[in-house]
Design a protein with these regions (language model features):
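S-adenosyl-L-methionine-dependent methyltransferase catalytic core, i.e., the SAM/SAH-binding region
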Residues: 1-167
Length: 167
């Protein structure tokens, strides 16, 4: 499922109004807002609607497909606003380093949605769906790391045991 309208019609965003209402946008300074786990872009699109044209919005997601879909949606939302937007394909663990790369040293607001995207469950080939058959992958970025299938089928029992005990 990669049709944006189909995805938006199926997804229900949690705490959307509460989050957006809780963030105060200053009109006398540049607001820099970071969405550290973009996911389904609802929070980001509502936040951009609220921001000033001179503000900066930075969004992170380790899943490149989420970023590609979100870019399309957020370009629509931002076409009249002209908020400066930065798309970063990285995990929020790298937030400080990634922000430094784009010369951002201080932020106004940051928020995290520490769950996974419903896309990961809805599409069997995306990540890990327990509702549909699909490859055993379990990577947010399919260009990095080994698949879960590669690990399960090539690691020694002792290595697998160590992974399961550690994580």
């Amino acid at each position: 499922m990669s049709n944006i309208k189909d995805i938006e019609n199926k997804h229900i965003s949690v705490l959307l109004t509460e989050l957006v209402d809780s963030i105060e946008i200053k009109n006398d300074k540049k607001n820099i807002i970071v969405d550290s786990t973009l996911g389904m872009w609802w929070h980001a699109s509502k936040m951009i609607e609220k921001m000033n044209s001179w503000d900066i919005f930075v969004w992170f997601d380790a899943d490149i497909k989420n970023l590609e879909l979100a870019r399309i949606r957020l370009e629509e939302v931002n076409k009249n606003k002209k908020v400066e937007i930065h798309l970063i394909n990285s995990n929020f663990w790298n937030l400080k380093d990634e922000l430094e790369k784009i010369w951002i040293k201080e932020i106004t607001w940051i928020y995290y949605d520490l769950w996974l995207s419903s896309l990961h469950l809805d599409e069997a080939d995306r990540w890990f769906s327990f509702m549909k058959d699909g490859p055993l992958d379990m990577r947010l970025n399919k260009t990095k790391w080994k698949t879960a299938a590669d690990i399960v089928n090539s690691y020694k029992d002792s290595e697998l045991r160590e992974i399961f005990l550690k994580y």
